[in-house]
C-alpha cells in the first residue's frame, strides 16, 4: 500500500518516464549499476524498477535514523568500505538469485559527470558471473536533492527519466595479480557506465542543443566574450544568431554550403548558429590558406557565398582576397546593419520569445558544418559533419572530463580548425562554461595575460603554442588552470617539463583528427598515462591493421558516432564520399575511418602514437619513422624546432632530410645520441639543413608538403625560409545590429 502510494506521488511530482526493456530484469544473477546523482536515487529505483532488488548501502548510511524507517520497505545490505571481505556477502546474495543494486561511484556526483568508479562493484560482477544492467537516472540532479547547487540552475520538480540499458557481462580480466585484475575490472565497469551515458544522450541539432543549454543553465547566464571584452549571455548570443540568420537567408538558400571567413569572435559563433538554424551549412574557411586555398575549398564544397568582415580583412591584411577570389559572392557583416528592417526586428523579437520556432525542419543526422583538413599532406579536403557527430564528440568529452558552468575556456585556436571549433566553442556552450574567444594563438605574450585576466580554468593548444606561452608567462598567470590539453601535434618533452616545473601543471595530451570531430582519445585526471594520448573516447570502436615493414603497432581504424558523414574533394566537387576502410582481410567496410596513423594500444586501452603511415621513409627496404628522426634531434637540441622529410634517392629509394633551427647540429652529434638511445644508424640523416623557422600551417602544425618540396631541392641557401603561417591580427569582426 505504501509502495503504491509513494509511486503515485513521485509519478505526479516528477513526471517519471521509463525507457528501455523491463523484461531483461528476469535474470537468475543480476547486478544493477545506476549512476548516482541525488539523495532520491535509491527511492526512485525501489519504486520504479520492475523487480524488488537488494541495495548495497555503506554502513555509514545504513546506520542513519531514516534508514530504519525505510527498512520495512527496502531490502539493503550494509557494506563497510574499510573491510574488503564485506563484498563477499554481496556475491552470496547474487548467487542466491536475488538482484542487487550497487552505485559504483559510491557518492553523489558534484559535477554532473561520472565520478570515480570503485572496483568493488566490478569485482562482484566478475566473481559472481552476474549479468550487469546499467541504469541511467537523468533529471533529478537538478532538484534540491542533488548536489549541484551553483553548478546548474535548480528546479523544484524537474522531469525525471529512468533508462534501462541493454544487459552486458564483465568476465574477470586476466592479470598478474588479484589487485591488477580488480583494477582492470573497475576500469571496464567505468567504460560500461560511460557507454550508458552516451547511449542516453539527447538527439539534437546544434541549435536545439544550444537552446537546451540556455534552458538548463539560465538564459541570462554569461556564456561568451571576445577581444571587445563585451560578454554575452545565452540570450544575447541568441539575439545575434537570430539577427544573422534573418539577413543571411536573403543571400543563400536552404542546404547551401556558406563560406565563413571570420576570426575567433562572438559574431562568428552567432553566424554559425544563425546559418545552422535556417538550414544553411557553414563551411569554415582557413584565412591563412591564401587565394588558391580558398578557391580549392570553394570548388570542393560548392561554395558560392562567403561571409566575412571588412574590418577583419583590413586588419588581417587580406583585402586583396575578394579581388583574387572574385567568383564568390562576398557578404560583409558591416553592410548588413543598414539592411535591417522593422519587419526583421519584429521577427527577431518574436523568436526571442519563442526561439524553437525559428529553426527550419532538420534532423540530427543532417549535414551541419564543413571543415577542411589542414593540407599537411596534400590538397585540403572538405569534411562534412552532421549535427549528431559534432554533438556526440562534445558528449564524449563531457563524459570523461568534468567541465562545469564554473569553468572558463580560453579559445585561441582558430574556429576553422576542428579542435578550435569543438573544444573551443561547442563544448563550453553546451557545458554552460564561459568561453573567451581570441583571434590568434600566435600572440605568445598576450594569451597568458588573458588567461590570467579572465580567470581561465581550461586552456588547449598545440605543443608549439603551449611551449611558447610558457616562455613568456609569469608563474602566476596560469594559477587557476585545471585543464591544459595539448593536441594536433606530439607533445614535446621540453614543453611537458617546463609546464610542470614553472607552473606545477601537468599537460594532458590528446589525439584527434578532423574526420572524428575531432577528439579521438585524451588523457584526463581520472585516467592518465604519460607519453600516451590517453584512452579512446566512449562509444568508439577501434582496430589495428598490420602494415608490412612496420613492426610496432598497426594502422588505426575507427568507427563511432563522431565519425564524419564524408569527404568533399576538389577532384570530385560536390560529391560526398562516405567513409569506408579495408579490414585485415582486404574487405571494404562502410562506416569505418582509416586514420593513417600507426598506433599501439596497451592492455588498459591507452593509445600511443608511433607515427603516420605517410610519415615513414623506406630506406634500402627498411621502414624508418620520420617522427623518430625528429625525436632524436629533440634530444640533441630540445630548444630548437625540427622536422624530418624524405627525398628521392637513386641507390636507396629514399633518403632522410632533417630541417632544424639549430645551426650547430651535425650528423656526428646525432650519431652519438643514436648510439646511446639505441636508435639504428639508418635513422640518422646525412642531409641536415638549417632554416630560420619551419613552415607552419594555420593550425600550428608543420607544413609537410612544403618540407617535402624543399627536401627535393638541392641543399642551398634557398632552404633558409620564414614561417608560412599568416600572422593573425588582434581584431574583432563587426556585428550587424538587430
Curated annotation (Swiss-Prot):
The chain crosses the membrane at residues 258-277, 409-433. Pfam families: Acyltransferase, AMP-binding. Keywords: Acyltransferase, ATP-binding, Cell inner membrane, Cell membrane, Ligase, Membrane, Multifunctional enzyme, Nucleotide-binding, Transferase, Transmembrane, Transmembrane helix. One of its GO terms (cellular component) is plasma membrane. Its main location: membrane. Its EC number is 2.3.1.40, 6.2.1.20. It catalyses: a 2-acyl-sn-glycero-3-phosphoethanolamine + a fatty acyl-[ACP] = a 1,2-diacyl-sn-glycero-3-phosphoethanolamine + holo-[ACP]; a long-chain fatty acid + holo-[ACP] + ATP = a long-chain fatty acyl-[ACP] + AMP + diphosphate. It is a multi-pass membrane protein. Residues 233-646 are annotated as: AMP-binding. Residues 15-138 are annotated as: Acyltransferase. GO terms for biological process: fatty acid metabolic process; phospholipid biosynthetic process. The active site is at 36. It comes from the Bacteria. SMART domains: PlsC (SM00563). It is found in: Cell inner membrane. Plays a role in lysophospholipid acylation. Transfers fatty acids to the 1-position via an enzyme-bound acyl-ACP intermediate in the presence of ATP and magnesium. Its physiological function is to regenerate phosphatidylethanolamine from 2-acyl-glycero-3-phosphoethanolamine (2-acyl-GPE) formed by transacylation reactions or degradation by phospholipase A1. In the N-terminal section; belongs to the 2-acyl-GPE acetyltransferase family. This is Bifunctional protein Aas. It comes from Pectobacterium atrosepticum (strain SCRI 1043 / ATCC BAA-672). The lineage of its organism: Bacteria, Pseudomonadati, Pseudomonadota, Gammaproteobacteria, Enterobacterales.
Amino acid at each position: 500500500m505504501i509502495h503504491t502510494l509513494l509511486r503515485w506521488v513521485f509519478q505526479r511530482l516528477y513526471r517519471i518516464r521509463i525507457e528501455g526493456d523491463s523484461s531483461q530484469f528476469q535474470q537468475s544473477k543480476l547486478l544493477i549499476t545506476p549512476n548516482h546523482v541525488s539523495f532520491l536515487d535509491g527511492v526512485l529505483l525501489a519504486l520504479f524498477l520492475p523487480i524488488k532488488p537488494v541495495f548495497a548501502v555503506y554502513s555509514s548510511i545504513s546506520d542513519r535514523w531514516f534508514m530504519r524507517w525505510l527498512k520495512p520497505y527496502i531490502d539493503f545490505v550494509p557494506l563497510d568500505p574499510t573491510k574488503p571481505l564485506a563484498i563477499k556477502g554481496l556475491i552470496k546474495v547474487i548467487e542466491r538469485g536475488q538482484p542487487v543494486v550497487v552505485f559504483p561511484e559510491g557518492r553523489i556526483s558534484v559535477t554532473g559527470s561520472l565520478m570515480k568508479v570503485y572496483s568493488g562493484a566490478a569485482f562482484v560482477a566478475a566473481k559472481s558471473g552476474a549479468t550487469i544492467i546499467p541504469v541511467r537516472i537523468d533529471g533529478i540532479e537538478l532538484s534540491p536533492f542533488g548536489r549541484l547547487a551553483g553548478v546548474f540552475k535548480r528546479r523544484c520538480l524537474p522531469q525525471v527519466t529512468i533508462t534501462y540499458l541493454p544487459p552486458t557481462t564483465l568476465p574477470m580480466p586476466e592479470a598478474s595479480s588479484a589487485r591488477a585484475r580488480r583494477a582492470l575490472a573497475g576500469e571496464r565497469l567505468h567504460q560500461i557506465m560511460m557507454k550508458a551515458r552516451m547511449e542516453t544522450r539527447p538527439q539534437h541539432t546544434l541549435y536545439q542543443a544550444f537552446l537546451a543549454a540556455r534552458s538548463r543553465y539560465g538564459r541570462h547566464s554569461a556564456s561568451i566574450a571576445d577581444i571587445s571584452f563585451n560578454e554575452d549571455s545565452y540570450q544575447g548570443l541568441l539575439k545575434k544568431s537570430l539577427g544573422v540568420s534573418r539577413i543571411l537567408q536573403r543571400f543563400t538558400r536552404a542546404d547551401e554550403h556558406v563560406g565563413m571567413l571570420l576570426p575567433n569572435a562572438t559574431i562568428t559563433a552567432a553566424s554559425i548558429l544563425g546559418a545552422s538554424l535556417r538550414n544553411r551549412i557553414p563551411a569554415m574557411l582557413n584565412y591563412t590558406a591564401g587565394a588558391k586555398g580558398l578557391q580549392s575549398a570553394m570548388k570542393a564544397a560548392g561554395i558560392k557565398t562567403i561571409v566575412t568582415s571588412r574590418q577583419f580583412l583590413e586588419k588581417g591584411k587580406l583585402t586583396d582576397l575578394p579581388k583574387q577570389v572574385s567568383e564568390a559572392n562576398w557578404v560583409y557583416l558591416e553592410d548588413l546593419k543598414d539592411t535591417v528592417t522593422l519587419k526583421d526586428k519584429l521577427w527577431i523579437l518574436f523568436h526571442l520569445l519563442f526561439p524553437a520556432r525559428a529553426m527550419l525542419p532538420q534532423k540530427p543526422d543532417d549535414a551541419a558544418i564543413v571543415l577542411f583538413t589542414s593540407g599537411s599532406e596534400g590538397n585540403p579536403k572538405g569534411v562534412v559533419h552532421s549535427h549528431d557527430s559534432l554533438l556526440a564528440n562534445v558528449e564524449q568529452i563531457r563524459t570523461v572530463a568534468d567541465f562545469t558552468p564554473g569553468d572558463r575556456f580560453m579559445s585561441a585556436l582558430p574556429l576553422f580548425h576542428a579542435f578550435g571549433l569543438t573544444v573551443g566553442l561547442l563544448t563550453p556552450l553546451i557545458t554552460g562554461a564561459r568561453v573567451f574567444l581570441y583571434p590568434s594563438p600566435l600572440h605568445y605574450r598576450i594569451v597568458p595575460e588573458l588567461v590570467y585576466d579572465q580567470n581561465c580554468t581550461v586552456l588547449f593548444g598545440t605543443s608549439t603554442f603551449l611551449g611558447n606561452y610558457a616562455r613568456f608567462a609569469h608563474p602566476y598567470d596560469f594559477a587557476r588552470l585545471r585543464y591544459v590539453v595539448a593536441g594536433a601535434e606530439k607533445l614535446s618533452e621540453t614543453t611537458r617539463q617546463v609546464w610542470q616545473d614553472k607552473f606545477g601543471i601537468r599537460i594532458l595530451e590528446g589525439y584527434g583528427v578532423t574526420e572524428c570531430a575531432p577528439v579521438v582519445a585524451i588523457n584526463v585526471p581520472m585516467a592518465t598515462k604519460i607519453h600516451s594520448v590517453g584512452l579512446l573516447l566512449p562509444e568508439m570502436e577501434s582496430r589495428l591493421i598490420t602494415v608490412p615493414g612496420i613492426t610496432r603497432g598497426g594502422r588505426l581504424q575507427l568507427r563511432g558516432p563522431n565519425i564524419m558523414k564524408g569527404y568533399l574533394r576538389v577532384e570530385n566537387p560536390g560529391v560526398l564520399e562516405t567513409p569506408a576502410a579495408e579490414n585485415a582481410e582486404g574487405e571494404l567496410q562502410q562506416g569505418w575511418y582509416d586514420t593513417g596513423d600507426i598506433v599501439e594500444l596497451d592492455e588498459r586501452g591507452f593509445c600511443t602514437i608511433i607515427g603516420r603511415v605517410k610519415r615513414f621513409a623506406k630506406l634500402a627496404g627498411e621502414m624508418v619513422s620520420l617522427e623518430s628522426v625528429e625525436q632524436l634531434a629533440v634530444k640533441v637540441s630540445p630548444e630548437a624546432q625540427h622536422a624530418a622529410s624524405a627525398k628521392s634517392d637513386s641507390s636507396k629509394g629514399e633518403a632522410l632530410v632533417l630541417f632544424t633551427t639549430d645551426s650547430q647540429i651535425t650528423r656526428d652529434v646525432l650519431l652519438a645520441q643514436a648510439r646511446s638511445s639505441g636508435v639504428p644508424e639508418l635513422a640518422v640523416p646525412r642531409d641536415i639543413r638549417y632554416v630560420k623557422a619551419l613552415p607552419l600551417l594555420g593550425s600550428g602544425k608543420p607544413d609537410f608538403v612544403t618540407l617535402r618540396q624543399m627536401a627535393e631541392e638541392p641543399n642551398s641557401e634557398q632552404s633558409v625560409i620564414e614561417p608560412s603561417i599568416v600572422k593573425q591580427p588582434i581584431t574583432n569582426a563587426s556585428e550587424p545590429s538587430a
